[in-house]
C-alpha cells in the first residue's frame, strides 16, 4: 500500500471519530454551551494520543506505515492540534525553548489572524 493510501484511510477514520466525538460533546454540554467543549476535548485527547503514539513508535520502531496511518492519518483527521503539540514538544526536547514558544504563540496568532482575514475577504465578496 502507498503512503498516500495509509494517510487517506487513517484520515477518513480520524474524521469520522472527530464527527462522533463532537456530537457526543454537544449532547453532554448542550447545543448552547458558550465554551467549545467538543473541540477542546478533541484537541486534548488527540494530543495525548499523539504523545502515546510517538513514545510507542520510538520504543518499538513500529514503522513508517503505522506512523503514517495512525499519526498523520487518524490523529491528523481527528485533530491537527495533535501534530502542532508534537512539533512544539520536539522543539522543547531539542532545547530550543525560545523557538518552541515562538512557534506555539505564532501558530495560534497567525492561525486566528488568518481565519479573520478569510472572513473579511468573504464579507467583501458577498
From Swiss-Prot:
GO terms for cellular component: plasma membrane. Na(+) binds at residues 76, 79. The keyword Metal-binding applies. The chain crosses the membrane at residues 1-21, 33-53, 72-92, 97-117. It is found in: Cell inner membrane. NCBIfam families: crcB (TIGR00494), PRK14195.1 (NF010791). This is Fluoride-specific ion channel FluC.
Amino acid at each position: 500500500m502507498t503512503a498516500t493510501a495509509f494517510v487517506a484511510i487513517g484520515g477518513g477514520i480520524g474524521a469520522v471519530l472527530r464527527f462522533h466525538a463532537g456530537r457526543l460533546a454537544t449532547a453532554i454540554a448542550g447545543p448552547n454551551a458558550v465554551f467549545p467543549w467538543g473541540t477542546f476535548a478533541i484537541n486534548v485527547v488527540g494530543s495525548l494520543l499523539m504523545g502515546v503514539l510517538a513514545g510507542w513508535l520510538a520504543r518499538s520502531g513500529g514503522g513508517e506505515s503505522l506512523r503514517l496511518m495512525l499519526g498523520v492519518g487518524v490523529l491528523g483527521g481527528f485533530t491537527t492540534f495533535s501534530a502542532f503539540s508534537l512539533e512544539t514538544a520536539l522543539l522543547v526536547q531539542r532545547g530550543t525553548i525560545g523557538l518552541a514558544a515562538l512557534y506555539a504563540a505564532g501558530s495560534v496568532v497567525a492561525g486566528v489572524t488568518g481565519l479573520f482575514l478569510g472572513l473579511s475577504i468573504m464579507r467583501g465578496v458577498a
